[in-house]
């Protein structure tokens, strides 16, 4: 059961109740938590577009705690992060694994944060295929293209050579917050919200 807390605010016109995510959105904060799939991606994209249209000179903070998920859904979020004019701060808490690690590393350079005990996990995309031989071959080629694309994005984001990414994503590769900074996927470890750049 997914319970969403409600926040009540007082104003001169009385009380107003918000679900917690709507209240955070007022402060330009978006929560990306849980598996990345189409419905979640659509909600994240809509929030990014809304906040950018509202004021493209202010940063958007994207808090990430996700095991990853559907690559096409994640790439839709990635493309939107690059499409909008607002800087997107990424703040990793808990875990940014798989496609979520791509998003965490795709924030505006200098504004990619992780909390001290966050983890980042990079690996090659997974998938399955069944059916006729030609269908399996097509699916295998598609997974190889996807791996190449993801590793290219991670190489650009981290400054690491593509050869290192190919090697380091061969299997699940877990990085602590400090290791993610050293690797170039994250810029800073943030222990206090006052360290966040506005």
From Swiss-Prot:
Enzyme class: hydrolase
Name recorded for this polypeptide: ATP-dependent Clp protease proteolytic subunit
Active site per database record: 98 (nucleophile), 123
Organism: Levilactobacillus brevis (strain ATCC 367 / BCRC 12310 / CIP 105137 / JCM 1170 / LMG 11437 / NCIMB 947 / NCTC 947) (Lactobacillus brevis)
One term under GO cellular component: cytoplasm
Gene Ontology annotations of biological process type: protein quality control for misfolded or incompletely synthesized proteins
Function: Cleaves peptides in various proteins in a process that requires ATP hydrolysis. Has a chymotrypsin-like activity. Plays a major role in the degradation of misfolded proteins.
SUPFAM superfamilies in the cross-refs: ClpP/crotonase (SSF52096)
Subunit structure, as described in the record: Fourteen ClpP subunits assemble into 2 heptameric rings which stack back to back to give a disk-like structure with a central cavity, resembling the structure of eukaryotic proteasomes.
One Pfam match: CLP_protease
Gene that specifies this protein: clpP
Keyword Protease part of the UniProt annotation: yes
EC number, UniProt record: 3.4.21.92
InterPro entries linked: ClpP (IPR001907), ClpP/crotonase-like_dom_sf (IPR029045), ClpP/TepA (IPR023562), ClpP_His_AS (IPR033135), ClpP_Ser_AS (IPR018215)
Covalent S-S links between cysteines: none
Family according to the record: Belongs to the peptidase S14 family.
Gene3D superfamilies in UniProt: 2-enoyl-CoA Hydratase, Chain A, domain 1 (3.90.226.10)
Subcellular location: Cytoplasm
Gene Ontology molecular functions: ATP-dependent peptidase activity; ATPase binding; serine-type endopeptidase activity
Reactions that this protein is recorded to catalyse: Hydrolysis of proteins to small peptides in the presence of ATP and magnesium. alpha-casein is the usual test substrate. In the absence of ATP, only oligopeptides shorter than five residues are hydrolyzed (such as succinyl-Leu-Tyr-|-NHMec, and Leu-Tyr-Leu-|-Tyr-Trp, in which cleavage of the -Tyr-|-Leu- and -Tyr-|-Trp bonds also occurs)
Keyword tags: Cytoplasm, Hydrolase, Protease, Serine protease
